[in-house]
Amino acid sequence: MAGTDSPAAARFVYRCLLFAPAIVVGLLLPLTLPPIAAAQRHTASDNPSTYNIGGVLSNSESETYFHTIISHLNFDQQYVPRKVTYYDKTIRMDKNPIKTVFNVCDKLIENRVYAVVVSHEQTSGDLSPAAVSYTSGFYSIPVIGISSRDAAFSDKNIHVSFLRTVPPYYHQADVWLEMLSHFAYTKVIIIHSSDTDGRAILGRFQTTSQTYYDDVDVRATVELIVEFEPKLESFTEHLIDMKTAQSRVYLMYASTEDAQVIFRDAGEYNMTGEGHVWIVTEQALFANNTPDGVLGLQLEHAHSDKGHIRDSVYVLASAIKEMISNETIAEAPKDCGDSAVNWESGKRLFQYLKSRNITGETGQVAFDDNGDRIYAGYDVINIREHQKKHVVGKFSYDSMRAKMRMNINDSEIIWPGKQNRKPEGIMIPTHLKVLTIEEKPFVYVRRMGDDEFRCEPDERPCPLFNATDSTANEYCCRGYCIDLLIELSKRINFTYDLALSPDGQFGHYLLRNNSGAMTLRKEWTGLMGELVNERADMIVAPLTINPERAEYIEFSKPFKYQGITILEKKPSRSSTLVSFLQPFSNTLWILVMVSVHVVALVLYLLDRFSPFGRFKLSHSDSNEEKALNLSSAVWFAWGVLLNSGIGEGTPRSFSARVLGMVWAGFAMIIVASYTANLAAFLVLERPKTKLSGINDARLRNTMENLTCATVKGSSVDMYFRRQVELSNMYRTMEANNYATAEQAIQDVKKGKLMAFIWDSSRLEYEASKDCELVTAGELFGRSGYGVGLQKGSPWTDSVTLAILEFHESGFMEKLDKQWIFHGHVQQNCELFEKTPNTLGLKNMAGVFILVGVGIAGGVGLIIIEVIYKKHQVKKQKRLDIARHAADKWRGTIEKRKTIRASLAMQRQYNVGLNSTHPPGTISLAVDKRRYPRLGQRLGPERAWPGDAADVLRTRRPYELGKPGQSPKVMGATPAMLGRTRPQQNILPPRYSPGYTSDVSHLVV
């Protein structure tokens, strides 16, 4: 055992434990430890009530704190269920890993520990924690490390049940990516050792960057990878390769000893001074020769053993509590000598531990699939003079977004060379002064507020230097040209200072007197003047390439091809409250309204005078149906026109119904025409532009009511000067020219300027942004935008080649889509709009003729109906007269028969009463006082027997005979009785004696 204390023996044991843990534990332990009975298993309802938590700690202070935390845990109901108690079992970490293995078996596993918390001194190496992990993992007992950060513990094939509350060293690659994104560095050189941790951090960086840069605009690429063997003696050979690379940003993972060698040799090559950026891991920060300006990372709570002990205990308690509520926990193994023990509950407990996510003393505690701590916080350290470490930022957990966030105060960073300005991070042979000008969408300019100290990530500072004032006004610029400048600076490796045009002009040349002499000289203004007079190195702006400018400056190949076009405002169309009436002309609307009421009136008249306007079903007891009144006719006409349901008041006559069908057809055509024309007003295009293009006669011969203009001193202004055929037009528009394109566009929108002639790119952008604007005609004066440089500039070819590559790679097309077509809120409007013609009487005359034909047809039909009805009435009258005559004749015949029968019965009756006289000799007289009607017909004195027939017909059956005797017995037939008409009850006639012409007998 003594030999294992030497460094060589320790390395040997470490390799044995690393590659053959099963051999060491499986062969050594059974030979040295007595066999112990296998662990007993509990049923599903027998979860243990006591849980022993083991601790392999590095000092007595940690042991005491571990015991205290376990004691306090038992009173925390949030983590400990009822009737559950935790106990601590601790041992001291031994530097000898073999002794550590025996101690774990004898003092921890023997006491049935359910998990082990392990810590060790940072200077003692990771052999002893590895031994604890091997031994516990063999029996599936979870191990929680609070200080081990080597990458080897992430290998679950070896450390099957190990997790830790500290992140491994190679997780610092995640922080590197955040820092590179913050500083916008695009090329880096990675320096790492060839051990497990060094290669792990390289792999982590490469793997994470593939997904990380999907969410950010700035992508960092690894230009060079430098790998070295640990225990360096010299790093000079690698520095030579690094010096020839373009990147000046170095990401280094090295131990403290190796970092000292690297910093020493880099200082000799002047690679730790101005313009270089060093970002290192924690170990390198502790080198005694770390250069000023180096940025490094330091894990928060890295040396807080108490905080990690507490977090590990509470993570374990949280996992056990959830496991108790979900499943049965078998007792922990107790025998290190039984290699057949398979504690499934330990494997399940390890899974529960990995799923924990709690807020502890060391921050947000959570684990990845390898059991490594995630959401660990880091301090960003800046090395100052005399090796002072200054915190300039933090990488911490954002609980609102549930992810990590980088926050760095750039103003507090001292960069290598004691510079306050952030290095560009690449090799820059020349620093250029670049000028630009505000021109949407190529350059947007925003003035910085008083409380702003830097521009937005997509902006670049572009101060405006006034010739009359030494101070600069701070502005921020972004846009098409700014992105082009950024990409150019990356591609051909130059840095720049960006500024705005001093006078806000592109520039044109003027003839000026030379010091009061008679000679004149040409002098350029604006951007051109700055470049010609060598006060600027480059112009990156929508600068049109033309012969006048090309004579004095160099142009690159065009980065944007365009031409000249005309911008005008579309004819406005007012919208009123009666806009819905626009599909029809006023005349047509009036005719439709009149037609509705005329048709209603005609329907009423047809139904009123039609003989069939009212009818009644045969054999029906219901009253006859009412005819269509005027109100119902109007309702019917409007209902048909507006396609509403007609529930009542419909025409009854055939003539009116024919008109109703014709009216329905008219309404269908009117409504369909109105609907179609209304849709045309809503969705079809407006009228075309007023101008057809530059060759429009109204432009060539400008009228007073048509004003056009451009920007004075611009390339368009020069184009009109060169074109002889446009000289007349130019003389007219010269007085109207504007100082800037922005002013002219605003006047076009207000209607003060009819036509603005300018570059097509800008005008198409404005037209696509505002539907009230439109470009007229085809392009003319085709040219392009180029990057301007000084005459003979060595950068011309490099810029030209870079722009050609941008065209081939699609970068320029990307800028077009981003800034010209999609750089603003697009309006869904077309280039032109057409207004449909308003429908008039001429268009709809056929419909009204159809209505007239319907009305005439209805009138004709009613005339035919009236004539036919008259003929029918005459025929019916003749039939009624004949029927009446026949009925009267029949009645007379029946009356006579009745009288004769009555007389015969009376005679028979009288014979029965007065047998002295025969029936034929007896005469009857009726008292007219009792029967006044008979008296009137017989005269003032007597009523004759024949005139009593009416009275006899009215007599009841019992009056014609004896009581109870039917009329048949008395000689009266049922037919005779049936022809009697109803009369009032009258008394039977009283016959009194009277005289006749024959006085031979007495009349009673």
UniProtKB/Swiss-Prot annotation:
Question: Which protein is depicted?
Answer: Glutamate [NMDA] receptor subunit 1
Subunit field text: Forms a heteromeric NMDA channel with Nmdar2.
Instruction: Name the family the entry cites.
Output: Belongs to the glutamate-gated ion channel (TC 1.A.10.1) family.
Gene Ontology CC entries for this record = NMDA selective glutamate receptor complex; postsynaptic density; postsynaptic membrane
Cite the record's Polar residues compositional bias ranges.
994-1004
Question: From which organism does this entry originate?
Answer: Drosophila persimilis (Fruit fly)
Provide the residue span(s) of the region labelled Disordered: 980-1004
InterPro entries in UniProt: ANF_lig-bd_rcpt, CaM-bd_C0_NMDA_rcpt_NR1, Glu/Gly-bd, Iono_Glu_rcpt_met, Ionotropic_Glu_rcpt, Iontro_rcpt_C, NMDA1-like_ligand-bd, NMDA1-like_N
* Residues linked to a glycan: N270, N326, N357, N409, N466, N493, N513, N705
Q: Where is the signal peptide?
A: 1-39
Q: Which residues bind glycine?
A: P542, L543, T544, R549, S715, D759
Q: What does this protein do?
A: NMDA receptor subtype of glutamate-gated ion channels with high calcium permeability and voltage-dependent sensitivity to magnesium. Mediated by glycine. This protein plays a key role in synaptic plasticity, synaptogenesis, excitotoxicity, memory acquisition and learning. It mediates neuronal functions in glutamate neurotransmission. Is involved in the cell surface targeting of NMDA receptors. Plays a role in associative learning and in long-term memory consolidation.
Q: How does it sit in the membrane?
A: Multi-pass membrane protein
Do you know which CDD domains this protein is assigned to?
PBP1_iGluR_NMDA_NR1 (cd06379), PBP2_iGluR_NMDA_Nr1 (cd13719)
Q: In its keyword annotation, does this UniProt entry include S-adenosyl-L-methionine?
A: no
The record places the following residue ranges in the Extracellular compartment, namely 40-585, 685-843
**SUPFAM superfamilies xref list:** Periplasmic binding protein-like I, Periplasmic binding protein-like II, Voltage-gated potassium channels
First-listed, main subcellular location of the protein, grouped into a coarse class: membrane
Keywords (alphabetical) are: Calcium, Cell membrane, Disulfide bond, Glycoprotein, Ion channel, Ion transport, Ligand-gated ion channel, Magnesium, Membrane, Phosphoprotein, Postsynaptic cell membrane, Receptor, Signal, Synapse, Transmembrane, Transmembrane helix, Transport
Q: Where in the cell is it found?
A: Cell membrane; Postsynaptic cell membrane; Postsynaptic density
- Output the Gene3D superfamilies linked to this UniProt entry: 3.40.50.2300, Periplasmic binding protein-like II (3.40.190.10)
